[in-house]
């Protein structure tokens, strides 16, 4: 295997086929207590999901630390799971009283953000670090050099992007290798199937993760959902499956091997 395929194969073997997103575990959603979060971590792991997706900004910069404290109380060992986190968005919050939301991919901020994530998650390394969203002002060379150094230091195992277009991935170059792109994709948001995102990832051997894989199916009542619901009701009978299982199965059948 060449280097890129080897890295991706190693990551695939590390990540569970379904990934647990943590955005709504804390202040931006369920506001779970430490005990409740510990229980959810253990239950998730028992169900075969060993990969947890974070971002520094979740919960206004609070959810990573809450998860880290809860994970430390769990019966799950660090080497049995994979931590993904994202950086690059500067988000105004009580923890960071900024005047305006903006992007920051300077070497100083990349190091600052990663250091905080490592401390908050109570770990020595991140399995996969993603650039959260593309910035029109990002310095690709500076990003390359910083991430390459962080990988050599053992602080991150792999590097990827989130919400990047094919041309934006090309801008970042090939060293270090972009191994994953986390994009919005679901049965109610199918742009990635036709805008070239999935095609590009397949031809460049880049892994695909889908955020919001259930889409707006359970949230809205627009014509798309109205059209889908009777179809899924019939499929529920055929496959003895729930609606959410069918929505995930649809994604996972794609040849890009999408990880929801």
PLM regions: where:
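N-terminal binding-site loop/beta-alpha segment at the start of enzyme catalytic domains
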Residues: 2-82
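Acidic (Asp/Glu)-rich catalytic clusters
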Residues: 12-14, 46, 70-82, 118-122, ...
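Short, acidic/polar
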Residues: 31-44, 105-121, 165-170
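Active-site groove signature of glycoside hydrolases
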Residues: 118-137
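Beta/alpha (TIM)-barrel catalytic core signal, keyed to glycine-rich beta->alpha loops juxtaposed to Asp/Glu
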Residues: 134-260
